Amino acid sequence: MSKGKPYIDIRGYHKGVTGSCIRNTVHFSDGKKFRFLVDYGMYQGEGHHGIEYNDSVSPEKIDTILLTHTHLDHDGALPIFVRKGYNKDIYMSDASAAVIDIGLMDSYNIMKRDAKLKRQPILFSESDIEQTIKQIKAVKYEQTVKIHSNISVTFLNNGHLIGASAILVQIDEPGGIINLLYTGDYKPNNIFLDIKPFPSWVYALPNLTIISEATYGSTNSWEVAHTWEDDIIEACSRNQLIFNCAFGQGRAQELMYRIRMLQDAGNIPKDYPVLIDGTTTVSYTFRYLDRSNIIQMKEEAKNFLPYNIQFVDNKSRPALLEKKNRAIFISTSGMGSHGPAATYIPHFLSNQNALMYIPGYASEGTLARKIVEANYGEEILFKDGHSVIKKAEVKQTGEFSSHATADQIIEFFQHFAPLSILLNHGEPKNKEILEARVQKELGIKKTGILGMGYVYRVNSYGIDKAVEK
């Protein structure tokens, strides 16, 4: 590294798809440093218990935090960081700032419950969430802000989730210019939002390194079958009971909107009961409606609630468990193991007139995965000790994924002239496959995969070297 030239050390702390945290250390030409994080999330999924996070980052050594979006695997550890002493700014889009409290409070309530049931620790308090929110700096899309006299940041719209951002970081000093684009979890479109191209000046940036997700680095868009709507139409024509597992933020609202559009088109009856269960689903649904202007929802999408909708609570749920036909349920959790879904599934699985849908990924060990993989007529044992014979039809689709497929990521890269590309957020195999494709199809040789133990040093010419630490 030439003396007097700025560079940045980039380290990813997550090998897979959860626990997102990228530490960035800017080294200026005068020897001074500025450190910022992109995201600070919890580890989730099989083998984790909702209390794991990267605890190797010291709050006193971080100068600012940039948040790409409000999924707990990206923002869930922020109150822990604040509790440990972080007292500086947390930048995010204004749409993310409008909803971030819902997920953090839900995480806190789950921790309180698990503290009693499983004797697990409570890692932060309600006051820590309140303090975290006080430190938020809400930024509009395409608004450029200074986080240091030589560092500018611009949040750019992203279809992954309402409020999600790709984040452009520009380091500019006499010794050199470095441009960095962090995609976050990226998708080029969103049913609720008008996702516009980035400003032309962003695509034209020189000295650019892209730090991109690679969740579906081995999957192409033409490999994903779109079956859900046809299946729902067919099931409604048969007066079936339809049960959908759904994540409370984003996925549940999209399913509601798609049902509403099927109703408006006359494809399913408007009087078909639509039952929504899950506290986070209800909270996000009404927050989206209340803050639709901040969220910049498309005008036609603001009426996303289906006809004949009912929001379910603990009091009304027991009677609904006895339903045998003619109803559409949408319930958390997305993988079936938690929330009301864990109660509904054992009741509905033995119903020959039920269609049970998993509209997303189901990880190993989850209830959704178990019922998808079980054969018809197989006996399924539940955690409480009772068993049920699988008689319902169980289907799964990947069409609602909020992540770009590999071909969409390659197409996204083609709008730029990057000197180098770093990949993160994906299983190791998917990152390796996408890296090889980037090198072959785009001719970019300066590539790397972020992971524990490695720091990539980036300067005005892209990746300079990888340092093992």
Model-based region annotation:
Residues 2-66, 71, 75, 80-254, ...:
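His/Asp/Glu-rich metal-coordinating catalytic cores
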Residues 25-27, 170-172, 197-200, 227-228, ...:
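Short, solvent-exposed amphipathic alpha-helical segments in soluble enzyme
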Residues 228-367, 424:
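Hard-cation-handling environments
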Residues 221-225, 305-316, 334-337, 375-378, ...:
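A general structural motif
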Residues 380-412:
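Generic long, charged, amphipathic alpha-helical segments
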Residues 432-455:
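Short acidic, glycine/proline-enriched helix-loop-strand junctions
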Residues 413, 417-423:
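Proline-aspartate-enriched helix->loop->beta-strand connector
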Residues 150-155, 287-295, 409-412, 458-469:
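Short, surface-exposed amphipathic charged segments that create phosphate/polyanion-binding patches used
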